[in-house]
Amino acid sequence: MSGLLRRRRVFAAKVEATVGTAESLTAAEAAFNAEEFTIQPNVAITRRQGQGGFNYLPGIPEGMQGTCTVRFGMSYNGTTLPSWASVLLPACGWVATGLVLSPVTQGPGGAAGVKTLTIGEYKDGKLSILSGAMGTWKIIAETGKQAMIEFTFTGKYSTNETDIAILTPTYPTVLPIRVANGALTFNSVALCTASVEIDSGNTVTMRECVNASDRSGYVSAIVTDRAPVITANPESALVATQDRDALWLTSSAQAFSMQIGATGNSITIAAPKAQLENKQQGDRNGIMADDLTWLCTAGSSADTELTITFD
């Protein structure tokens, strides 16, 4: 028997029609340019002590869940939402209205459009699946490099691995957007950064239920809280240009906006009320920098603290 190759893998994901009920996956659901993805089961075994000596009886599996980590270059063709956004972000609580994705405070399956996913990892003749999955995301934008988004999903590990032929999808051909020729501002002042990270800050929990329709012990995952955070390392500025100590130490929330790419083929992440939570001195190859952390606080209404707009 030849060895199975780790690089020979395909990622697939599909929105579930019924929360927590696994969907069948086909090549159409694998039309992603996914990188560094894997599904890891997380199933504890309860040990059972035997009698008469130092021995144990066969253990009992507890709740059956797992995680999937996956990352994508942030591609966009300038017209329609890419699959990494239209399929995966609603399972993180960010729902699209046209080309704008906004956070929603609601469990999956409701009218607001929050979803759960069935996720498959096809790996050189085998398949692992999570169902009822929801997750959290983080955007990594390093200047001059492709913009990346990383997802971590949690879901039910309700079926064992199976042997199955690997899918052969038609992959997207649109290139990821480079972090260049864009715009980055805080309180209307341009920031010159080497790196920006934007973390959705979701708290994902499994919904235990004795009435669950499979062996897992869970209905699905659910997002129960979020605290979006932005970190960046802009060059330091004179106080006359931007008084960052004052912005930090007076609880002053101001607008943050980052446009990745040129207008007409760009992705903009906006936080209308970003509050500086920390400011430390940094060093970028001898250039004075400020290591900044913002919390995306409430905007003018609920669920407006952090939006993603495709232009």
Across the structure, where does each feature detected by a protein language model lie?
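Signature of extracytoplasmic/envelope-associated structural regions
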Residues: 1-311
